[in-house]
């Protein structure tokens, strides 16, 4: 529960469960009304809702595979992507109806896996079922990662101009994770340039960029994953 006057400006909620499983966010309340209620409750509390949309991983058939392969499998499956794009459309319909500011953090991790599977950091070289789904906002768009990004932006523009659209820049998408490699400043600039080039290859513009530090804290990785303390930050990390 939020206490009035506590000073927080945002609260966030993951939308998950897969687009074709029958247990995704759209089923949490009838016909996607979970988003409607969450936005309304946020506005009443004086905070901006942030939704992290994490649906491709748990969709079928890729959910049974390891995460990188499962994401790729789902992105290239026409039936899966049709249900997925319909699900994204439902979100924008619900969020757009509110008229208040909503932040949509679109698919953390997806872009990192796609970048690693692309040629020369070019999202247009990675196949994604987009136009071939015949989903109305995807018609005529290329069957690649750029087509996916362009479709999501087009949906937002048409259905929910009040939604701030967030791109997730996975800093490990280059294949090198700076959290572990401790790169020099020069090397870090090279990696950043590659991440920027991948984003630019998508041929459209999001509004804000999200980036992770870690998905677990350093002590968890040391004692549960047994990484020997490699995840702890030092003075060179910032």
State the predicted function of each range.
Residues 1-94, 231-237:
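N-terminal carbohydrate-binding/catalytic regions of secreted carbohydrate-active enzymes
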Residues 8-12, 46-50, 101-105, 162-166, ...:
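Structural preference for beta-strand elements that scaffold enzyme active sites
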Residues 91-138, 163-169:
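Active-site groove signature of glycoside hydrolases
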């Amino acid at each position: 529960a939020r206490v009035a006057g506590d000073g927080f400006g945002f609260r966030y909620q993951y939308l998950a469960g897969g687009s074709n499983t029958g247990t995704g966010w759209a089923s949490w309340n009838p016909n996607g009304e979970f988003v409607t209620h969450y936005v309304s409750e946020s506005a009443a509390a004086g905070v901006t809702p942030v939704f992290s949309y994490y649906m491709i991983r748990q969709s079928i058939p890729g959910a049974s595979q390891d995460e990188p392969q499962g994401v790729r499998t789902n992105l290239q499956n026409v039936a899966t992507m049709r249900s997925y794009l319909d699900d994204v459309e439902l979100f924008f319909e619900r969020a757009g109806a509110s008229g208040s500011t909503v932040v949509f953090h679109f698919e953390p991790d997806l872009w990192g896996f796609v970048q690693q599977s692309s040629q020369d950091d070019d999202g247009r070289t990675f196949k994604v079922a987009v136009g071939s789904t015949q989903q109305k906002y995807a018609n005529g768009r290329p069957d690649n990662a750029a087509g996916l990004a362009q479709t999501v932006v087009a949906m937002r523009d048409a259905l929910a101009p009040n939604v701030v659209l967030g791109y997730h820049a996975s800093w490990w998408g280059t294949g090198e994770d700076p959290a572990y490699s401790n790169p020099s400043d020069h090397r870090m600039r090279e990696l950043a340039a590659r991440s920027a080039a991948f984003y630019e290859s998508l041929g459209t513009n999001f509004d804000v960029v999200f980036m992770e530090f870690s998905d677990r804290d350093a002590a968890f990785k040391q004692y549960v994953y047994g990484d020997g303390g490699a995840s702890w930050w030092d003075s060179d990390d910032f």
